[in-house]
Protein backbone atom coordinates (compact mmCIF):
# COMPACT_ATOMS: atom_id res chain seq x y z
CA UNK A 1 0.00 0.00 0.00
CA UNK A 2 1.23 3.48 -0.83
CA UNK A 3 1.58 6.26 1.74
CA UNK A 4 -1.40 8.17 0.32
CA UNK A 5 -3.61 5.11 0.53
CA UNK A 6 -2.50 4.51 4.11
CA UNK A 7 -3.36 8.09 5.10
CA UNK A 8 -6.78 7.79 3.45
CA UNK A 9 -7.44 4.48 5.19
CA UNK A 10 -6.43 5.84 8.60
CA UNK A 11 -8.65 8.88 8.11
CA UNK A 12 -11.66 6.92 6.89
CA UNK A 13 -11.40 4.24 9.59
CA UNK A 14 -11.60 7.01 12.19
CA UNK A 15 -14.60 8.57 10.46
CA UNK A 16 -12.80 11.82 9.71
CA UNK A 17 -13.44 14.04 6.72
CA UNK A 18 -10.50 15.47 4.82
CA UNK A 19 -11.41 18.84 6.36
CA UNK A 20 -11.31 17.50 9.93
CA UNK A 21 -8.06 15.64 9.27
CA UNK A 22 -6.56 18.79 7.74
CA UNK A 23 -7.42 20.86 10.83
CA UNK A 24 -5.58 18.37 13.03
CA UNK A 25 -2.34 19.10 11.15
CA UNK A 26 -2.87 22.77 10.28
CA UNK A 27 -3.08 22.16 6.55
CA UNK A 28 -5.84 22.66 3.99
CA UNK A 29 -8.32 20.05 2.83
CA UNK A 30 -6.68 20.26 -0.60
CA UNK A 31 -3.33 19.35 0.97
CA UNK A 32 -4.85 16.21 2.48
CA UNK A 33 -6.39 15.38 -0.89
CA UNK A 34 -2.98 15.80 -2.52
CA UNK A 35 -1.40 13.47 0.05
CA UNK A 36 -4.06 10.84 -0.51
CA UNK A 37 -3.68 11.10 -4.30
CA UNK A 38 0.12 11.15 -3.99
CA UNK A 39 0.50 14.50 -5.69
CA UNK A 40 2.49 15.61 -2.64
CA UNK A 41 3.58 14.10 0.65
CA UNK A 42 3.49 15.21 4.28
CA UNK A 43 6.76 16.44 5.72
CA UNK A 44 8.53 14.26 8.26
CA UNK A 45 7.25 16.16 11.29
CA UNK A 46 3.65 15.74 10.09
CA UNK A 47 4.22 12.03 9.46
CA UNK A 48 5.48 11.69 13.03
CA UNK A 49 2.36 13.47 14.32
CA UNK A 50 0.08 11.18 12.26
CA UNK A 51 1.99 8.17 13.54
CA UNK A 52 1.65 9.29 17.16
CA UNK A 53 -1.97 10.42 16.93
CA UNK A 54 -3.24 7.21 15.32
CA UNK A 55 -0.77 4.78 16.89
CA UNK A 56 0.63 3.63 13.53
CA UNK A 57 4.37 3.15 13.24
CA UNK A 58 6.33 5.25 10.78
CA UNK A 59 7.75 2.02 9.45
CA UNK A 60 4.26 0.82 8.56
CA UNK A 61 3.31 4.17 7.00
CA UNK A 62 6.44 4.48 4.90
CA UNK A 63 6.90 0.87 3.88
CA UNK A 64 3.28 0.43 2.93
CA UNK A 65 2.47 -2.56 5.10
CA UNK A 66 -0.63 -0.94 6.61
CA UNK A 67 -3.49 -3.33 7.41
Report the location of each language-model feature:
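Short coil turns linking two alpha-helices in DNA-binding domains
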Residues: 17, 28-31, 43, 57
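Short, charged recognition helix plus adjacent turn
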Residues: 64-67
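A detector for short, charged/polar N-terminal pre-domain segments
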Residues: 1-2
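Central "turn" residue of the DNA-binding helix-turn-helix
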Residues: 15, 25-26, 38, 55
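Conserved hydrophobic/aromatic packing and binding residues within compact polymer-binding modules
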Residues: 7, 21-22, 32-35, 61
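Short, Lys/Arg-enriched C-terminal cap helix and immediately downstream tail that follows
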Residues: 8, 44-45
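DNA major-groove recognition helix of helix-turn-helix/homeodomain DNA-binding modules
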Residues: 45-60
Amino acid sequence: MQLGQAIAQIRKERGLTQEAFAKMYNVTRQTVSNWENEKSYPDLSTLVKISDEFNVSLDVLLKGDFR
